[in-house]
Amino acid sequence: MQQTNTNDKTKDEQMTKKILILVAVWLIFAFTDYFYLPYFVQPFSWLLVCITLLVLLVRQIVKVIKERKNLKTNRLLNLSITLFLFFLTFYNFNKIPNSIIEKIDWNISYNKRLKIVKEVLTNRLKPNTEMNNGICRLPFDFPIISNGGNDIWIYGNKTESTKTIKFWISRGFFDSPQTYFIFTNDNEVKKQYEEQIKRKPEYNWKLEENWYRIMERD
């Protein structure tokens, strides 16, 4: 009897450890996907994680059925967490975790982005790629300021001496739109964004004076 209790305790501990490892690995994936993965890699990593979680979910369901006469709390917890992580990942391409991380990203990197904006406005930072398409490649350090490569897009209105600076949140993939944190002191551009906010407020909103969160489809 004592041996049986010891075995059950060991199994419970192993199950708890597996749950913690699964959650930790998923969190690493979520943050890596948001901050670091190139946009052309994201759909494949997302698909791989979805398939992995689906396989784990099926395994948990099978085990619950087999152990239904002597079901442990940890088994149900494992099933629930796996199902929850699968839902978070599968639903609208990571929409829920990405929305949470986006809010964290905006607050944590606010001062760093503000510093970059000041450098652009004083012409210390300019487009620096060979294609001369408005892209400025920033040094690759942590935390990432502009996702999917740490590039920013700079547009200068020479007539009005104003600038619009885009920091990527997501570069999108397949037919997905791109999303940005955008600074602009150009009144015409502001009007465009205000119109976008009116049309689709669930995807576009004003963060503060001169700052917007905008979703665009190129």
Model-derived segments and spans:
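Extracytosolic and intramembrane catalytic regions of membrane-associated proteins
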Residues: 118-218
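Membrane-embedded alpha-helical segments of integral membrane proteins
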Residues: 15-64
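Internal/C-terminal transmembrane anchor helices
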Residues: 71-97
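Negatively charged, low-complexity tracts enriched in Asp/Glu with abundant Ser/Thr
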Residues: 4-14, 139-140
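Cytosolic juxtamembrane helix at the C-terminal end of the final transmembrane segment
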Residues: 59-68, 99-107
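Alpha-helical transmembrane signal-anchor/signal-peptide segments
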Residues: 96-120
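Membrane-interface helix-boundary motifs at transmembrane edges
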Residues: 7-12, 63-76
